[in-house]
């Protein structure tokens, strides 16, 4: 095993680029900051309180001392109540003459927690602070709790509809008198009006025609068990109305009782619906920008602030006219591409300051909004990873920020092992990011500029530092330093695979930073992966930007995962016994798409030809039907005969189809300049009886990759081609550096030969490299800021072709009914990526390869917050 070290830059790079490209590893830095796998870093302001899995909403008690935080992650969902601190009054006796009132500071801490079976974003106190209301999501209820000095006592739920109907209550708003509650039903495409005293839903206002949108995906409380049942579930899922372009996905509610209005942000449409409370009908729709989510209303009701997650902006609506008074740019740079993901807002008690949570930038933007229409930026406050909720205490002294993915890095070599029951499942990557609450003291009086100046500087320092100037990159580097400059590489073939870590594939290579004890598929199983890594350039410091496949394919194709995807995949993966949450990405829902589209949109815009082989393409409605896509930009640009995700279909046959197309292109004299190829079988089907064994699946995937590279390298296009290979995510495989570290390959006549490149790269680095080669504009802040893969290339081409290594194991080996984990695998759904429980699946794969008596070692992870002591339960 080689421990990573910083390497000198090769000679083909200009000397000024050397320091910028030195190897780095995610985790704690000497200066106290934390480097994330995506090349951003953290240095949060204030005090931090550890929380649970993916906190998404903070409700501050009217009294100001306590705050309730709702958690809606993949794991157990809950509400944690935090004593936000501040000051408490204490009277010192003056023996009856001069009693003295002393204000003493209160330590901030978590004081209680209650489990919630299922929830989605909605959380609100009653005006008197005696009750807390919480969305019941798939249970189709509003949870009710009595609140007393930080303690929550569950009360009977308020039913909104029958549990068989799909509404999914989301954002909540409570009337000033505490008698009525409004709930946006995000999948029901409606808003409910609730009589709290009567515990009754008075009616639903639909923003689109009711019908199949309110149905379950499958009318069963059990996951689909057979291939036929799973296929039916997927077909029903794809046919649901919410995937239609006009589905609004109502998200948040904001009451304006003096005007008799309810404002509802429509997540999938760039507008806010204005509901007349008297008639309970939509009176108007006010334009915002893409992905409106949380709102904040001034005390006078004159101005409504709306966060637009897909556009880095906040729309300031004049409620007297329904028009935008101004648009605030919340990103670090006004000209920044999408990626800041503003998803929460808070106004100071005097309505002069606006705080905007930028989930993608890990900071809070601060604006002076004393005069709406003439607002100005005051600066930024650095916080933790992916802030999801920002609130100001009623006295205006403190800012509370829920950080969805935590604060810092920590290895867990002695942590619980996957495959065990109970707490062992905390090691699954979807639950590895316990959040944190940042409590930040705000400046008093006029000290804003002085307080914000160092915070703003830190916020800029936490963003990826600017890449090398064009002059710093050697002129003969095949990767241009800027879009529009020439490259000897004309064609990019982008191969996407499924869910593996670096150590699982390449941990046995002594020249790389690997751990051979964690290598599940060594050279005997993956001879082509090993041969490619040694003949070309070994990348041992590459990280995927995603957590699971739902966001992984979005990151891999769009350099971004939207607010919708990040907030819905945990429910689809971890809370879907009712089958109410469809798989949220890969072109199923228009609301999931990034504002600037995907890489094929950039290619079309630049006049670059492109073609997809199985990516963002689904099988026909019936067996034998041609493939289809819901994305207009892919119509006419995908192979209708290339087999989509189906683990019963060999990757070598997919490779054969691609090679047949390649031969056709050779005959025609030209091929698409950008080709995206999906080879998914390294996902494996576990030990499902009758399915290929994990070893056979991996060997099939390996041979398919080798054959594709062989065919391309022996073709007429090879001298001008670069092949890029990555995994969409790393899904909790063992890795001794980080759970996001993943195998990646650059294969080209211009790729370095027999070299090791330990530069820190990410999914977005690979996208950025292809963009520079093809002359495509970046899609988001993340690929725009990512480190291009300059060091993986060399100036002089080496045209030697690649010859695929034959399989060394039986590709037709099948699981038996007595294989370890066969019973568990039989129950898994393998018709779609990640439909199976990845924690159990990884244990099954490990024991299948290493032996039934060999437990899987725990993975290590960096740049994340790990399990912290839970706050005390109620006695």
What are these regions (language model features)?
Residues 1-5:
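N-terminal secretory signal peptides that target proteins for export/translocation
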Residues 8, 119, 129, 134, ...:
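Compositionally biased, intrinsically disordered low-complexity regions enriched in proline and serine
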Residues 9, 397-399, 629-632:
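Intrinsically disordered low-complexity regions specifically enriched for long asparagine
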Residues 15, 42, 430, 549, ...:
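A generic structural signal for short, non-catalytic loop/turn and secondary-structure boundary residues
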Residues 20-477:
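Predominantly soluble domains enriched in secretory-pathway, periplasmic, or organellar proteins
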Residues 452-875:
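N-terminal pro-sequences and low-complexity stem/linker regions of secreted or lumenal proteins
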């Amino acid at each position: 095993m080689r421990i990573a070290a910083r390497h000198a830059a090769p000679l083909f790079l200009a000397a000024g680029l050397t320091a910028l490209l030195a190897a780095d590893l995610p985790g704690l830095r000497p200066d106290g900051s934390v480097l994330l796998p995506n090349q951003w870093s953290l240095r949060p302001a204030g005090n931090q309180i550890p929380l649970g899995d993916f906190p998404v909403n903070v409700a501050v008690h009217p009294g100001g001392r306590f705050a309730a935080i709702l958690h809606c992650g993949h794991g157990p969902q809950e509400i944690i109540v935090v004593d936000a601190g501040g000051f408490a009054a204490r009277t010192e006796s003056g023996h009856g003459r001069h009693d003295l009132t002393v204000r003493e500071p209160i330590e901030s801490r978590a004081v209680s927690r209650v489990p919630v079976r299922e929830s989605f974003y909605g959380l609100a106190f009653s005006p008197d602070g005696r009750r807390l209301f919480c969305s019941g999501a798939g249970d189709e209820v509003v949870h009710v709790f009595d609140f007393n000095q930080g303690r929550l006592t569950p009360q009977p739920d308020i039913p909104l509809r029958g549990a068989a109907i799909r509404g999914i209550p989301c954002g909540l708003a409570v009337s000033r008198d505490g008698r009525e509650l409004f709930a946006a039903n995000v999948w029901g495409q409606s808003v409910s009006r609730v009589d709290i005293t009567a515990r009754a839903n008075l009616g639903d206002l639909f923003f689109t025609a009711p019908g199949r949108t309110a149905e379950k995906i499958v009318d069963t409380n059990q996951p689909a068990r057979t291939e036929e049942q799973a296929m039916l579930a997927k077909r029903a899922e794809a046919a649901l109305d919410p995937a239609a372009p006009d589905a609004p996905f109502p998200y948040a509610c904001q009451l304006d009782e003096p005007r008799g209005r309810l404002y509802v942000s429509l997540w999938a449409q760039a507008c806010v619906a204005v509901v007349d409370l008297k008639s309970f009908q939509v009176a108007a729709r006010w334009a915002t920008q893409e992905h409106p989510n949380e709102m904040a209303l001034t005390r006078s009701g004159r101005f409504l602030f709306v966060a637009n997650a897909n556009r880095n902006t906040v729309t300031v609506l004049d409620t007297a006219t329904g028009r935008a008074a101004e648009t605030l740019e919340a990103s670090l740079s006004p000209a920044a591409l999408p990626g800041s993901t503003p998803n929460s807002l808070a106004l100071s008690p005097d309505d002069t300051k606006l705080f905007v949570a930028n989930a993608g930038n890990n900071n809070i933007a601060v604006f002076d909004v004393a005069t709406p229409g003439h607002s100005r930026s005051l600066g930024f406050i650095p916080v933790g990873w992916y802030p999801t909720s920002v609130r100001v205490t009623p006295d205006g002294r403190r800012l509370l920020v829920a950080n969805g993915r935590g604060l810092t890095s920590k290895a867990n070599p002695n942590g619980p092992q996957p495959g065990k029951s109970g707490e062992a499942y905390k090691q699954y990557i979807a639950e590895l990011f316990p959040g944190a609450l940042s409590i930040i003291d705000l400046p008093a009086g006029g000290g804003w500029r002085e307080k914000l100046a160092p915070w703003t500087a830190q916020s800029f320092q936490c963003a990826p530092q600017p890449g090398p100037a064009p002059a710093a990159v050697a002129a003969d580097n095949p990767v241009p330093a800027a879009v529009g400059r020439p490259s000897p590489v004309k064609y990019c073939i982008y191969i996407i695979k499924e869910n593996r870590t670096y150590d699982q594939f390449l941990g046995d290579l002594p020249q790389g930073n690997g751990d051979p004890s964690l290598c599940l598929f060594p050279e005997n199983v993956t001879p082509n992966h090993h041969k490619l890594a040694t003949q070309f350039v070994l990348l041992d410091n590459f990280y995927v930007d995603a957590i699971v496949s739902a966001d992984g394919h979005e990151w891999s194709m769009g350099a971004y995962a939207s607010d919708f995807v990040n907030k819905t995949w945990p429910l689809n993966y971890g809370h879907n016994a009712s089958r109410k949450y469809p798989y949220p990405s890969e072109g199923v829902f228009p609301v999931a798409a990034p504002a600037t589209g995907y890489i094929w949109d950039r290619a079309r815009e630049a006049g670059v030809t492109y073609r997809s082989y199985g990516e963002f393409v689904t099988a026909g409605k019936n067996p034998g039907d041609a493939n289809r896509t819901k994305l207009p930009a892919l119509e006419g640009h995908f192979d209708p005969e290339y087999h989509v995700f189906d683990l019963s279909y060999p990757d070598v046959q997919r490779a054969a189809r691609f090679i047949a197309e390649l031969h056709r292109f050779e005959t025609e004299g030209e091929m698409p300049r950008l080709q995206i190829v999906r080879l998914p079988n390294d996902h494996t089907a576990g030990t499902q009886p009758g399915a290929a064994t994990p070893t056979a699946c991996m060997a099939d995937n390996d041979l398919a990759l080798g054959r594709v590279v062989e065919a391309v390298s022996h073709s007429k296009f090879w001298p001008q081609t670069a092949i890029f290979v990555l995994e969409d995510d790393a899904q909790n495989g063992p890795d001794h550096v980080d759970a996001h570290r993943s195998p990646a390959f650059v294969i080209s006549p211009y790729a370095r030969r027999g070299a090791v490149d330990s530069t820190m790269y990410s999914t977005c680095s690979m996208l950025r490299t292809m963009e520079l080669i093809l002359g495509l504009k970046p899609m988001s802040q993340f690929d725009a800021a990512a480190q291009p893969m300059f060091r993986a290339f060399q100036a002089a081409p080496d045209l030697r072709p690649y010859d695929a290594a034959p399989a060394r194991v039986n590709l037709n080996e099948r699981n038996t009914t007595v294989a370890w984990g066969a019973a568990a695998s039989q129950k898994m759904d393998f018709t779609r990526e990640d439909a199976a429980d990845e924690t159990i699946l990884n244990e099954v794969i490990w024991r299948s390869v290493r032996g039934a008596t060999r437990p899987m070692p725990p993975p290590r992870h960096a740049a994340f917050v790990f399990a912290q002591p839970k706050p005390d339960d109620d006695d």
